[in-house]
């Protein structure tokens, strides 16, 4: 499950901290994104610009949403590329396991220059977070973290969500999975790397299950229930006909073959 370490990120709703030496950032951009950098290779900048635009369209479609708010002009999302992991963590204040972070209200993504596969995963994951919250209405109450991260993981790479059963079955044999109550109470900042990895894997698997078993339109309906202020149990009942979170946990475990 090495790939899950690569996408570990921090989801934030507070204002983005001041970036060090703001005047020293260079900028480039595309239709929907502004990219801030210092010494990032030109090839990386070109790929970030091109790939972020592809994610902007693909992720919206993957989640089954219809866009009404477009990131144009001054409303473009901003991507900050630090020169190293040390610089990124120093000025963003993120933990050592973080490869990227996103500040939802400001549509700001922070990461650092690294191998393309890792950076691409971070980019897709964080764009997924912004789109997910934007389509739900960022002024609404907070979502369950497992749903937030699971949706971002699915938007990032649906195929990888389908690969999690092998890892989850092995984890189940070695000591068990998180219950839904444990997922709901999970705090990444207070957890170890193995627990964080398991949390991401379970979260992405649950959301992947909802897509695979019920389809994209039902997930959009599920999210619409949250937008209307419904709680998790009522949203599950309305969109999927499930009795609530306990019913979802039972059906998901049956889907994995570990009930």
At which residue positions do the language-model features occur?
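Sec/Tat signal peptide C-region and signal peptidase I cleavage site
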Residues: 16-20
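A broad, structure-centric signal for solvent-exposed, well-ordered loop/edge residues
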Residues: 8, 42, 88-89, 130, ...
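Juxtacatalytic substrate-recognition/specificity segment
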Residues: 21-139, 144, 232
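Selective for proline/serine-rich intrinsically disordered segments
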Residues: 13-15, 103
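Acidic/His/Gly-enriched intrinsically disordered linker/tail segments
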Residues: 94-97, 102-106, 118, 138-259
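Sec-dependent N-terminal signal peptides
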Residues: 4-13
């Amino acid at each position: 499950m090495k790939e899950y370490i690569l996408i570990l990120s921090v989801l934030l709703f507070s204002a983005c901290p001041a970036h060090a030496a703001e005047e020293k950032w260079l900028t480039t951009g595309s239709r929907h994104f502004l990219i801030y950098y210092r010494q990032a290779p030109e090839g990386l900048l070109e790929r970030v610009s091109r790939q972020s635009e592809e994610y902007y369209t693909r992720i919206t479609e993957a989640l089954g949403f219809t866009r009404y708010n477009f990131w144009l002009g001054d409303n473009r999302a901003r991507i900050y590329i630090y020169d190293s992991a040390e610089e990124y963590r120093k000025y963003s204040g993120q933990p050592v396991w973080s490869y990227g972070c996103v500040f939802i209200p400001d549509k700001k993504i922070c990461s650092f220059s690294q191998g393309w596969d890792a950076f691409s995963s971070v980019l897709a994951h964080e764009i997924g977070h912004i789109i997910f919250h934007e389509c739900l209405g960022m002024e609404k109450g907070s979502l369950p973290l497992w749903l937030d991260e699971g949706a971002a993981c699915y938007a990032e790479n649906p195929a990888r969500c389908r690969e999690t059963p092998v890892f989850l079955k092995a984890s189940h044999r070695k000591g068990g999975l998180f219950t839904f109550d444990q997922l709901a109470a999970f705090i990444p900042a207070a957890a170890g790397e193995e627990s964080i990895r398991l949390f991401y894997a379970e979260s992405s698997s649950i959301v992947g299950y909802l897509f695979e078993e019920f389809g994209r339109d039902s997930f959009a309906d599920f999210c619409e229930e949250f937008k209307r202020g419904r709680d998790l149990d009522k949203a599950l009942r309305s969109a999927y006909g499930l009795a609530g979170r306990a019913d979802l946990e039972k059906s998901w475990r049956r889907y994995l073959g570990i009930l």
